[in-house]
Each structure stands twice: as C-alpha cells, then as structure tokens.
Amino acid sequence: MASANSKESLNAFFNNELSFIQTTLNKINDSFDESSGVLTRKEDNTVKIEIIEPFKEIYFINNDGIEIHDLEFNQIKIINKTDLINNSMYNFINDGFSKEGLNIKEIDDSSFSIEENNNFFYFEFINEKVLHIKYKDNMNIDNLIKFYKK
C-alpha cells in the first residue's frame, strides 16, 4: 500500500497510465453525472487526458496551460497558465505534489487531505492500483474521481 502522506507516492502513482471515472452530483436535477477517460503523462512531463464518455474530448496539459480539443464539435480552446494560477487540480496534474508548503494532513494509513487555495481535497489509496480523490470544484459541485492504474 502506498503511504498516505507521501508526496512521492502520489507523484509515482500519477506517472502511470491511468483510467478514471469522475462522478459529479448534479444538484439541479438531483442526479449523478459520470465521465470516464484515460490520463497519460509523457516523458516530457506533459499530460494527455482523453475523455471517452459522455463526450469525446482531449486535454493537453503543460507549463503553458491547457489545450482542449472537443472532438464532437471540432473545436479547440486554449486556457493560459496565468488563468489557472489558483486552479488546484491543474497545479496537481501539471506540477505534481511536490510544491513547497503543500498542506497535507494524514487521516490514517491510506488517506489524507490537502488544502490549497481554500480548497479541500480528500485522497484515499484503496490499494496500490486505485486512488480516490474527493473535492468541491470552483462551482461548489461535489466530485469523486476514481483513478485506476492500467
């Protein structure tokens, strides 16, 4: 089992090709929405996130920001890094979990929380191949992402 409070364990986990399922609570119609995809970190530390369902999208993440390809509408959108300065998920994915002063609180042997930019993230290693992350996004929507090593 990966050590819950280990930044190295998180960074090592995210250096693998990962499949994921993201579940969000839609408070408008009181339902759960799901998306799924694959996250791959390349040797140059850029990240490709391919959303498979419900919409076909590809996100390219690097030090310059995020490039979003909507494959169904054949559109590309670019978000510059300066617009993502307080986006914790971007920071975690792009920079890893080695940021100086990252506020990690161990809960038990397999779970911990991180507070960054007044946002709280709950991490739980289910086992060495599965990691769950729970958080509220910038629109106060509850998110659960289940990552699986391939």
Predicted regions and their residues:
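Boundary at the C-terminal end of the N-terminal hydrophobic targeting segment
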Residues: 2-6
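A short, Trp-centered hydrophobic/proline-enriched beta-strand micro-motif
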Residues: 11-32
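Short, surface-exposed charged micro-motifs
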Residues: 36-38, 56-58, 103, 120-124
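An acidic-aromatic
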Residues: 40-87, 138-143
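Gly/Pro-enriched, hydrophobic low-complexity segments
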Residues: 105-150
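Short, solvent-exposed coil/turn segments at beta-strand boundaries
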Residues: 14, 40-46, 61-65, 107-109, ...
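Residues that act as N-cap/strand-start positions at coil-to-secondary-structure junctions
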Residues: 31-35, 43, 53-55, 98, ...
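Flexible, surface-exposed loop/linker segments and immediately adjacent secondary-structure boundaries
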Residues: 73-112, 117
